[in-house]
Amino acid sequence: MKKAILHTLIASTLALLSHQAFAAQDEVNLRMSWWGGNGRHQVTLKALEEFHKQHPNINVKAEYTGWDGHLSRLTTQIAGGTEPDVMQTNWNWLPIFSKDGTGFYNLFSVKEQLDLAQFDPKELQQTTVNGKLNGIPISVTARIFYFNDAIWAKAGLEYPKTWDELLAAGKVFKEKLGDQYYPVVLEHQDTLALIRSYMTQKYNIPTIDEANKKFAYSPEQWVEFFTMYKTMVDNHVMPSTKYYASFGKSNMYEMKPWINGEWAGTYMWNSTITKYSDNLTKPAKLVLGPYPMLPGAKDAGLFFKPAQMLSIGKSTKHPQESAMLINFLLNSKEGVEALGLERGVPLSATAVTQLRASGVIKDEDPSVAGLNMALELPHKMTTSPYFDDPQIVSLFGDAIQYIDYGQKTVQETAEYFNKQGDRILKRAMR
């Protein structure tokens, strides 16, 4: 009897020691990076806390910043093989970091840990390069119009349904409200996307010819592109870059003319609209506007893209655990509840079901309503990620400044942008 008890005690002790040794070996340390504002930081930290409760052997170190400097920091990390295990990434980074699909870990390899069935295959296709899934799109977003309801009412105008109505609104704002009032304010990246929409409606062709690694527009069409910009500025539809620059370099939604309603609308991602609306002087709020369409247009020319993605670093030593973390954030009850709509209306089917049931997703919410409207518009023509290349966007910003500061004519600017842009595209697509 004593021997049996002794054997049992020895076996139990060995099992306990074995379990402790296994637990110690099984401890995993992950790093996760993202950018955003304080609201995004807080909900993501809460979600990581919940993940650790369910997986106490997995520690996640959070590396979060604002937008400024985030890309350059990540570029250095990726080049040195020191990137985080899990990263919030942008869709237009795929051509920069992963031209052949090997720049990020292939998520098709961790299907056991990551429930890909919750995502529309069409959306996953956008983030797949050479058959390798480089990121899970968290949500999709589109640029659409939102207007300051109080200021537009004061101007006595209905929200523009056509391009002509948009162009005519500037004169009314100037005459009725004063020279400092504009129907919309657009930063250079917003302007680039808006005029592309107009050109797509008119010509039904893509902006970039990926097969030939250059722009698809003719020289005459580029002149028309920049003429449209100058027309909007001349018609007082939007402030020039020169006037805009006089208010400093802070975020547009933190500038005084935005807060007090002098800039009475924007063409913005539906997923980010809350922070723009929250900064308005109450009781003013942003409301969704119609989308201007040219007669007979077959495509709205919307800029649709994944709002952000979650990717796994190609250098990770823990791909399975990294995939578990992504799955928790996007598909689990606790992760979905913690993140809410901070990164837009989620693409995960189970997340949408949960958030609708809990009343978080409401069709009248400006962000949700904006996405629903965008999805109803004709939008078969996809946007090339090269259109959103940081160098192309920066080049456009320089180009319209040349016009606003009188340094180049529209014709000269069109030629300059076409020539320099083709060079950028050729290098980027090598």
Please give the residue ranges for each predicted region.
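Hinge/lid segment of periplasmic solute-binding proteins
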Residues: 91-143, 167, 285-289, 363, ...
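Extracytoplasmic "Venus flytrap"
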Residues: 29-46, 65, 141, 384-388
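Glycine-centered hinge/linker elements that transmit conformational signals in sensory
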Residues: 170-171, 214-246, 291-294
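C-terminal capping/gating helix-and-loop segments adjacent to ligand/active sites or protein-protein/ligand interfaces
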Residues: 368-420
